[in-house]
Each structure stands twice: as C-alpha cells, then as structure tokens.
Amino acid sequence: MDEDTRLRDGPVPRGDEGQRLHSGEGQVRRSGLQGPVAAARAAGTGVYAALDLGTNNCRLLIACPAGDGFRVVDSFSRIIRLGEGISTTGSISDAAIDRALAALSICSDKIRYRRARRLRLIATEACRAASNADGFRDRVAAETGIRLEVIDRETEAALAVIGCSPLLDPQGRGAILFDIGGGSTELVRIARDPDEQDAVPRIKAWMSIPLGVVTLAEHFGGRDVTAQSYAMMVQEVAQYIAPFAAEHGGGLRNMHLLGTSGTVTTLAGVHLNLPRYDRRRVDGIWMSDADITATIARLLGMSYRERANNNCISVERADLVLAGCAILDAIRNAFPLPRLRVADRGLREGMLVEMMREDGALGGCR
C-alpha cells in the first residue's frame, strides 16, 4: 500500500438496537507489546498500528490521523498460511509457526521504528480453532514482543464493516458485505437510508461460517479444480449460507454486494488485465454480475501453472483462488445482486478508525 494512501473515515456501524458490536468472550487476552517493543508505545507519538494475523495472511498497517481519515506511513503483508493443515490435524504446524514468527518479527520492528503509541494486534480463525493456539501466542510474545488478541467472529464482522463502510453506495439502501478469509467467511447485512442526511449504516444481521479458502482448498483440492469439484465446493458453502439467506435475503432492492478479501481483489485485478496487482486501480471498483461470471469462467479455464504465472494471482494464491471463487459464487446465488464493489481494505482499517475515534484523534498527526 502506498504511504500517501488516504482512506476516508466512514460512520460507525451500529446493530439493530443502536449498540456497537463487541467481543462477547471476556476471557480473551487484549493485544499489545511487551519487552523492548513496548518502548514504542511509551514514546507518546501520534502513530497507530493495526495488525491482522489471519489464517492465510499476516498484515500490518501503521498510520496517523489526517483530517477525517488517516495517512498510511507504513504497511506489511505476507502470505504465511498459518492455518495450513489445521482442518485435519487440529493444530498449527511447526512450519507455519516459523513462517508466522518471521513475519511478526518484521511487524514488530516496523512498529518500533515508527514509534506507534496505540496498537491493536489481532488473530482470527486459526488461533480460534487450533489446539496449540495459546502456546503459539506465548511464543510470539516471547520472541517478538507482540501479544496477540484473539477476537471472536462477531468482532471480526464488525471491524470489517467499519473498515469498508466508506465504500457503500451513498445512493443505495445498504449492502451484503462479505469477508472471505482463510479459515472463515463473514457475511453482514448492512442497511442505510439514502434519504437521511449523513445516514449511518446499521448492521441488521451477520453470520460467520467455518469455511475459508484454505480449509475449502484443503478439503476439495485447489490445484487441479474440475467443474465437478468446483460445483461441490459451491454446494458445500451454500449449505452453510442457506439459513441466513432465507431469513435475511429478502428486500434487496437498491442494494449491492461489498467484498473484502484476497479473492475479490485478485478477481478484480484479473478482470482489469493488470500487468501486476495495483491497489489504487482495484480498491473501490465496481464489477457487474456479468463481469464476475466471465472472470471466474476465465480462471476455471486456466491450469494451475497459468494461474501461478498470472501476476495478479501468483504462486501464493494459485491453489486458493478458485476456492475463494466458489465461496463468492455461493454468496452470489444466495444474494442475487447486480453489482459488487471491491474493497482492498478491511480489518486493519476498521481497527485504526475505531482507535482514533476512541481517542478523539481524527484531526491530524502530532
């Protein structure tokens, strides 16, 4: 992400009763830094850091307030596949732990170098599911100084909404937001009244399913995907989504899909025929239903090697992208909306906005 990228501050989404969604598991540890890295927080600078350790990716965003949004001063993203094999073994592998520690050490160095004073450092599905997650987090704290907060799925959905709400169509009545992760997928129905000035988006309903690109690809195979295996993936996801769609899939007029995930950003890059992935070209673009169908068909027609050689996919995503497309197709079938807005933003941006609002800091760097 470019250092001068500015993201507008969107309204805080609230639930049916006007209450912000929150973690309901009082026993989870809060995030933070310890050891030598803690000195960065004590320095008192106006810099914020948000880290998202997911099942597939490790992502960091460091920013300071700028007007009604924030200015990114540093970032990091690396595919580490922390959740590789968890669906069969139940634990994080030694190789995955080593990959995560290497990435988190870089994040720790960046946080210290940028003297971030306000931090939120979260972990998601892999650390919710793995039997050795506590030991892994203890080792992360000991070796990198990063103390991870394992968030629940409700909090994950709420942060995605905060991060992506600036991309809601201001003339629309809301969206079906989805976040396709490595080990889980979140769906949120967001409502807004376009006739109200400064209409605040509200979370009407949400759900999370324990399927993501890593778990689905491990179960059905991600390298050599046939029409039959692809259809089976779509059907598997559809079974999880069906009850939510039956209850919350009506009255979709003047709404759109809003997707945040490596799947949709990759799909957008391929759709645009980009020579290499470019966030500035992808974040916020609209794709029609026909665009999505054509691009997925194009990917299904590629071999694993062809996908790996595409610079918007690369070898890191070549065995996962079709599993993500299957999840997207299941969502499209359940919520047949004509447009998708693509978001290259999400949990990190949500954490930054939330922290800055809590501090009353949306007014510039100190």
Where would I find each of the regions flagged by the language model?
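Broad gene-expression machinery/nucleic-acid interaction feature
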Residues: 57, 75, 175, 182-186, ...
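Non-catalytic pre-domain segments flanking phosphatase-related domains
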Residues: 2-47
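A short acidic Gly-Thr/Ser loop motif
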Residues: 52-57, 178-184, 260-263, 346
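N-terminal glycine-rich anion-binding loops that anchor highly charged ligand groups
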Residues: 68-82
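Local beta-strand/beta-hairpin segments that build beta-sheet-rich folds
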Residues: 43, 73-75, 137
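Helical "lid/coupling" subdomains associated with nucleotide-phosphate turnover
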Residues: 5, 15, 48, 62-65, ...
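N-terminal basic/disordered segments at the start of proteins
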Residues: 44-69
